From Swiss-Prot:
EC number: 1.3.1.105
PTM comment, free text: The N-terminus is blocked.
Record-linked SMART domains: PKS_ER
Family: Belongs to the zinc-containing alcohol dehydrogenase family. Quinone oxidoreductase subfamily.
Organism (species): Fragaria ananassa
Gene encoding the protein: EO
UniProt name for this protein: 2-methylene-furan-3-one reductase
Functional summary from the UniProt entry: Enone oxidoreductase involved in the biosynthesis of 4-hydroxy-2,5-dimethyl-3(2H)-furanone (HDMF or furaneol), the key flavor compound in strawberries. Can use both NADH and NADPH as the electron donor.
Amino acid sequence: MAAAPSESIPSVNKAWVYSEYGKTSDVLKFDPSVAVPEVKEDQVLIKVVAASLNPVDFKRALGYFKDTDSPLPTVPGYDVAGVVVKVGSQVTKFKVGDEVYGDLNEAALVNPTRFGSLAEYTAADERVLAHKPKDLSFIEAASLPLAIETAYEGLERAELSAGKSILVLGGAGGVGTHIIQLAKHVFGASKVAATASTKKLDFLRTLGVDLAIDYTKENIEDLPEKFDVVYDAVGETDKAVKAVKEGGKVVTIVGPATPPAIHFVLTSKGSVLEKLKPYLESGKVKPVLDPTSPYPFTKLVEAFGYLESSRATGKVVVYPIP
């Protein structure tokens, strides 16, 4: 294996860990001496620069999918941006010194890694990573992988194509902000509508939304028009199926799904990030950070508390690490 010549990789590192399931405020503990993960032949070791939080992180900590989870203790964190410091013998895409980003867990809910991104070092499979776009900061890059890949996979499953209309339920969240941008700039939707609370409607318009809907005042079931695609990012498929055209598609990332809606769980792929690189580098698709970001590594519990409050607009990022 090739290792960074200029940097000796320690055997232990600082990380946040939980050893039992529960609320993040109760179970997350800072540990200054967690073992640095071993790198398999198809993996790289990353010196983490920034990480972002996703709802799956706190749902996992609560034990929502403990039947398929990896054994505790767990260093949480799916999204990572950092620098490669060591490569496995079979790795061909990356070399020591490369700036990379990705969602560490190919299958989000089945044996996710015990060594997540909320640590100084993490190991990642080559196939889930991509080269960081040069124009993006590590903070911006860390905000993207799980959210933008989820947005992309859902739009593909919904067969959105040029000239079709789409309604996004939950347009201001981490995934919703990317559904809107990808629908508009990558998939060529003719009309993008999205829901948010009153004070976030102007924010939706800055993302390119044609019709911003205040869910506190309007029922989507009663809208005068129907849509070719409805993408539910909040868990309201019972309403979503009433807003879709005959023969249209409804996808959701929050189960269970009311038929004919399709529920899916992201398969993390670095190839999707590479495919979207031109749109990110041109600025057509932009990372969306919550105004409170970034949170320092020492304030991780507060960062989770904010994410869990459902108040975030865009992504909650942790930087610098440590």
